[in-house]
């Protein structure tokens, strides 16, 4: 058996992380990695402590927190810096999550699945010298 590459390893982990999602429409996971060590994980789900009441507007769930946001908030709560780290995400990030990842100092975004790929995401990454790439 061959040893998986780091990308293969974290790809498996982010897929399993997404399985924790309580969202019926889409299961998204995010794993933040620094120096090949996981510093945080998150998945999309309802607000902590709140009932799982779905509120959909314009085909988008309003009552959930995105996976990337949950991973970043976990770092903030625990006082862990994610500066110069890599985000492994199951789906192409939205504009808001991209802005948050970039503001937090994420230097590489690796995603598995195309999802409403907005050109602003790539534009913001380029402006911030952050690599965004799809893993096969």
Where are these regions (language model features)?
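Zinc-dependent deaminase catalytic domain
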Residues: 1-136
């Amino acid at each position: 058996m061959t040893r998986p590459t780091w990308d293969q390893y974290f790809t498996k982990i982010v897929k399993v992380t997404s399985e924790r999602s309580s969202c019926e429409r889409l299961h998204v996971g995010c794993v933040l990695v620094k120096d090949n060590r996981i510093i945080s994980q998150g998945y999309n789900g309802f607000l902590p402590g709140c009932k799982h009441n779905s509120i959909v507007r314009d085909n988008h769930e309003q009552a959930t927190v995105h996976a990337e946001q949950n991973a970043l908030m976990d770092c903030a709560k625990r006082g862990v810096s994610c500066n110069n780290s890599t985000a492994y995400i199951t789906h192409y990030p939205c504009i808001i999550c991209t802005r948050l990842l970039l503001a937090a100092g994420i230097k590489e975004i690796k995603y598995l699945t195309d999802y409403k790929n907005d050109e602003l995401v790539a534009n913001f990454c380029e402006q911030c010298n952050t690599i965004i790439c799809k893993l096969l």
